[in-house]
UniProtKB/Swiss-Prot annotation:
<dbReference type="Pfam" id="PF03144">
    <property type="entry name" value="GTP_EFTU_D2"/>
</dbReference>
<feature type="region of interest" description="G2">
    <location>
        <begin position="430"/>
        <end position="434"/>
    </location>
</feature>
<dbReference type="InterPro" id="IPR036925">
    <property type="entry name" value="TIF_IF2_dom3_sf"/>
</dbReference>
<dbReference type="Pfam" id="PF08364">
    <property type="entry name" value="IF2_assoc"/>
</dbReference>
<dbReference type="GO" id="GO:0005525">
    <property type="term" value="F:GTP binding"/>
</dbReference>
<dbReference type="InterPro" id="IPR009000">
    <property type="entry name" value="Transl_B-barrel_sf"/>
</dbReference>
<dbReference type="GO" id="GO:0005829">
    <property type="term" value="C:cytosol"/>
</dbReference>
<dbReference type="InterPro" id="IPR000795">
    <property type="entry name" value="T_Tr_GTP-bd_dom"/>
</dbReference>
<feature type="region of interest" description="Disordered">
    <location>
        <begin position="46"/>
        <end position="315"/>
    </location>
</feature>
<keyword id="KW-0648">Protein biosynthesis</keyword>
<keyword id="KW-0547">Nucleotide-binding</keyword>
<dbReference type="GO" id="GO:0097216">
    <property type="term" value="F:guanosine tetraphosphate binding"/>
</dbReference>
<feature type="binding site">
    <location>
        <begin position="451"/>
        <end position="455"/>
    </location>
    <ligand>
        <name>GTP</name>
    </ligand>
</feature>
<dbReference type="Pfam" id="PF11987">
    <property type="entry name" value="IF-2"/>
</dbReference>
<feature type="region of interest" description="G5">
    <location>
        <begin position="541"/>
        <end position="543"/>
    </location>
</feature>
<comment type="similarity">
    <text>Belongs to the TRAFAC class translation factor GTPase superfamily. Classic translation factor GTPase family. IF-2 subfamily.</text>
</comment>
<feature type="domain" description="tr-type G">
    <location>
        <begin position="396"/>
        <end position="565"/>
    </location>
</feature>
Amino acid sequence: MEEVTLDKLATDVGTTVDRLVQQFAEAGMTKKAGDSVNEEEKQKLLAHLNRQHGGGGSSEPSKMTLKRKTKSTLSVGGGRDSKSVQVEVRKKRTYVKRSASEEQEREEQERLAQEKEAEEAKLREEEKQREEEQQRKEAEAKAKAEREKAEKEKAEKEKLRKEKEKERQKAEAEKRAAMTPEEREAADKAKADAEKLKRQQEEEARKKAEKEAEAQAEEARKLAEENAKRWEEEEQKRKQQEKEDVHFTTSSTAQEAEDAQDFDEERKSRKRGKKRRRKDEESDDTPRREKRRKGARRGSSLQQGFNKPAQPVERDVKIGETITVGELANRMAVKASDLIKTMMKMGEMVTINQILDQDTAALVVEELGHKPALVKDNALEEEVLSDRQEGGEEAPRAPVVTVMGHVDHGKTSLLDYIRKAKVASGEAGGITQHIGAYHVETGHGMVTFLDTPGHAAFTSMRARGAGATDVVILVVAADDGVMPQTKEAVQHAKAAGVPLVVAINKMDKEGADPDRVKNELSQLEVIPEDWGGDVQFIPLSAHTGEGIDELLEAILLQSEVLDLRAEKTGMASGIVVESRLDRGRGPVATVLVQRGLLKQGDVVLCGLEYGRIRAMRDETGKEIKEAGPSIPVEILGLSGVPQAGDEATVVRDERKAREVANYRQGKYRDVKLAKQQKAKLENMFADMAEGDVAELNIVLKSDVQGSLEAISDALTKLSTDEVKVNIIGSGVGGITETDISLASASNAIVVGFNVRAEAAARKLVEQESVDLRYYSVIYDLIDEVKAAMSGMLQPEFKQQIIGLAEVRDVFKSPKIGAIAGCMVTEGVVKRSAPIRVLRDNVVIYEGELESLRRFKDDVQEVRNGMECGIGVKNYNDVKEGDQIEVFETIQIERTL
């Protein structure tokens, strides 16, 4: 036993040696400085100090006071003079802890009381059983007597009925013997009709009784469901109130006492309120109306004014071409959350602001029991466009030719020579600044030319499906060869499906080499006719006029093959080639008339704009009064600047044209949100139809020709039988607006290798939502394209065994059926996993686990070496010695 000196102990406990000696003396031990103190003496001193300071027992308090304070607000008065008063309720309770002996005595009394109560309950139960037995015997005797009496009465009635029937048959036989054969036949027929009528009446009465019984049963069932629902709500409300009841202590005894005191106070307050009301009613001899102040307002009635409909309300829901989920819910008078739940059950995950198409909205409306009324949002637009005077029979029209090519290859000079007018000299640096549209009367017929700066307008028209161009003339300088814009022109023409005529210009120069041009264009799959292809190559010189006639003949030959026809009378329609805001004349649009006759004063609906034509000018600036098919004209008088590619249509009524234009402007945003989603690498496979070859369209731009060829070759080799890589456009240099327009129109992605997009191209990317990606490592580019192609492949699934259990014994369960007592020998067994039952290593059943237990507890999984009980869904033929194989189906991600 460890001993310490008195000095050391005083230092440890933080007191003086003299004070410690005095405390030892009070405890009955004599000590002085320097003496040693053992463990037993320490315990004696500690016990003495506890008794001296009142801590002989537990340190818990014997009395506890709880205070509770609640605050609420009470509105006093009515009308404008009402005010709020803060009400504070304070409660104070004191709980006294019983001593151990009192607690023991109380528990003994409770035990005796419980035993006495159990004995009394047993006696009451026995007495009740004796009374029930006596009542049962009396009831049986009474029932037996009544049964015998009823049987006796029934026998007497049957005997009397037989006697009456015998007498009736005898009288009927006598009467029948006295009848003639005709009377006998009529009597038999009347008897048969009477029996048939009686059977029909009995059948109708039976059906009516069955219907009434079914109606009563249905009403009783509905009432039972309503009562059950109400009882469940009341029970939940009561549980919620109990849950919200706040106690100041965790002791169950204190909580019971607190609840009992609350109940007593509530009961007393209810009694006081009843007495006060009764006293007021007894003393109130005069009508309450007379006691009110004159002019005081009468209290409002609490009666509900809404009557529940007797049957579900079926509504006619009007659905436009697009409608949001929230608006559809409002039209059906249902909550948006309920509508979203319904669509989730139908397999559609939507939000409240998501736009639905007309077909989907109609299915949802029918699912909720309403009638969809499909409304065309553009009904007014169709009415305006249908109320037009169409022309008569079609007649041949002039071809519309678009001239394309690289900068400074002589496009405008070629047109200039054809028109015999020097237009190029007036333009900056001889480069076309805007779209020029000209029609030329030649000795071979009329031809309309579109001279484009680049290819933006042509791509825009192709993207809108305008089809304004009939033939493309590709101008290539014989001394310069194929250049980047030349390649872009070929790509645009092929994407639009427009026939191509190649004009090899500048043949009068010394360095002209037409064979080089043919070789370079053949690499772009533009094969000359003399090489076995289908493209006409015309060598010419815009400076000397050499080959111009051959070019015009080639154009007219191509137009004859296309058999171009249009109406030359009636209301005109066309397409906007270009538009601008002129400082002195306002919005000016160059319109190419495609059919009909356009006149000055006509009301034109042009995309989002409208207006009456105030003036018309041809390409030379000369004012004209009318223009027929394939004639380009400038028109003035529109409300705003239309977009290139918009359709221009002549209508009858200016007011309706304004309404249609305003509607289109309001609809523009909705259409932009609801239109088909652009191609993204993440969801490219969504556009792939089953069984078809998926195509990944790419517009590729690189910094140098070597990288471009290497990337193009690598991407093309990635194509498989299921996914095809289609490079629809490629080139060296920065990404331009033309590339973005081509990608937007062809549903492609734009890939840049060590190049960046121009500012205008970046703006167009945001507007058109085109997927634009930059790379600096060729392997990253190929890996991402390969990953996108892998996402477009059909998924593959594989079954993997995750556990094996051996059946040791079979038990019967009244709820589930046969329960297999198993030992898991391999892997893990999971609940609700698909399983196979094996007998002698042969699969005899395949299903899923319905129950998985371990020691009567439901578990989610059981691991190797553990016992468990397994219930197989819809299968009870499990025998000892069988094996249960648990597996799961996993999706294997396919790669190229």
